[in-house]
Amino acid sequence: MDNAEIQQWLEQLRTEHRDLDEVIHHLVDARHHDQMRIQRLKKRKLKLKDMIARLESELIPDLDA
């Protein structure tokens, strides 16, 4: 993958991460919320965060001195 593809993929992942954050907050604030669904969404959000960090590290050039 080249840098442009990584940047595009990162933007999609960040958007999904933000969207999940909003959904989770909405569900937590709801009077009757499904704890199992919230846990699944939080797990997905954490996976997205890990994927974002991995892709961001690919954009940083190796500086072997």
Stretch-by-stretch model annotation:
Residues 1-65:
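Extended, charge-rich alpha-helical interface modules
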